[in-house]
Design a protein with these regions (language model features):
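Hydrolase active-site cap/lid region
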Residues: 224-274
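Short beta-strand element of the alpha/beta-hydrolase
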Residues: 86, 97-108
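Catalytic-loop region of hydrolases
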Residues: 23-97
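Glycine-rich nucleophile elbow surrounding the catalytic serine of serine-hydrolase chemistry
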Residues: 214-224
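Cap/lid segment of the alpha/beta-hydrolase catalytic domain
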Residues: 110-119, 135-189, 243-258, 264
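Gly/Ser-rich "nucleophile elbow"/oxyanion-hole loop immediately N-terminal to the catalytic nucleophile
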Residues: 174-189, 193-216, 232
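Gram-negative bacterial Sec-dependent N-terminal signal peptides
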Residues: 2-20
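Serine-hydrolase catalytic core
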Residues: 279-303
């Protein structure tokens, strides 16, 4: 009798009621595992990289590699899907063992016309000086993110914050479909893949822990790499403090007289400002905001 009653009840549940139930479940979905799961999935694949150059600089040996770090195109809407990162390793004379500094660097695979652009956040001279002064192996991971990227339905290829903002728009538009759409996910994965390369190439230095740094969105990627990869021993992000991101953005808006700073324009342009305070934005922040990881099994990495 109970089974029959349940069956009859199901016949009269409206599609709207079913959609509401799915929506309620979606509100509570745990997204803090997404970046870590993505990183782990890449470790099951052979590492694809090649040595481009070795050259001796005063006080430091520089080794340049090309790393095909991953294939990333959520639902096939992003191209090119293969990510290529430059990995430059600076080994100073009498290098210290165990720890290496990893610099998440900018640069472009192409500038829209097929021409690569060298990284400018940290150049070769600066990285060499850091390695020599600290006797620390320094690893630069460039083209993070890969750019420019073409998104289906968008006429102009996107780079930097324009690309991040559009990836957020995809996620917010359909969290279930585009759960892995945030550009910070492959950005963090690029760094973890560079760790794998470094461990293979730096056996003499016995490197097994990494101090990760980067500027702006690469600083954000440094946070997320530290949370998702146990090989990170410390993180030094060069970025504004946006921990507790939703509250920070609300405070920013009020501080600018109920307006946004110029640097926020790519996100304003994609309508992200209209989503702050919504359940959809809160779901995005479960993946993006480092403080949301405090009460997870990764929370100890923030302490």
């Amino acid at each position: 009798m109970k089974i029959r009653t349940l069956y009859m009840a199901m016949l009269f549940i409206s599609p709207a009621g079913l959609a509401l139930s799915a929506g309620e479940n979606n509100k509570n979905i745990d997204l803090t595992h997404v970046i870590s799961d993505y990183r782990i999935s890449l470790t099951s694949l052979p590492l694809d990289y090649s040595l481009l150059e070795k050259k001796q600089r005063p006080g430091v040996m520089l080794q340049r590699f090309n790393l095909n770090s991953q294939t990333w195109s959520p639902q096939g809407v992003v191209s090119p899907e293969r990510w290529q990162n430059g990995v430059d390793i600076y080994i100073p004379d009498s290098a210290r063992e165990k720890n290496a500094l990893v610099v998440i660097n900018n640069g472009s695979n192409n500038n829209g016309s097929g021409t690569p652009v060298a990284p400018t956040n940290f150049n070769e001279e600066e990285l060499s000086r850091i390695a020599i002064a600290t006797r620390t192996v320094v690893i630069s991971v460039s083209n993070v993110p890969n750019q420019v990227l073409s998104y289906q339905g968008v006429t102009t290829p996107l780079g930097e914050d324009n690309s991040v903002a559009y990836s957020w728009k995809l996620f917010i538009g359909d969290t279930h479909k585009y759960q892995d759409a945030s550009l910070h996910i492959p950005m963090a994965a690029s760094v973890s893949q560079a760790f794998r390369l470094a461990k293979k190439e730096l056996t003499q230095q016995n490197i097994n822990k990494f101090i990760v740094t980067g500027a702006s969105k690469r600083g954000w990627a440094a946070w997320l790499t530290a949370l998702s990869d146990p090989d990170v021993g410390a993180v030094v992000p060069f970025a504004m403090d946006l921990l507790n991101t939703q509250k920070s953005l609300e405070h920013m808006y009020q501080s600018y007289g109920k307006n946004w700073p110029v640097a926020f324009y790519p996100y304003y342009n994609q309508g992200i400002d209209q989503q702050v305070g919504t359940d959809k934005f809160a779901r995005l922040m479960r993946l993006e905001d480092p403080l949301t990881y405090l009460n997870t099994d990764m929370g100890d990495r923030l302490k």
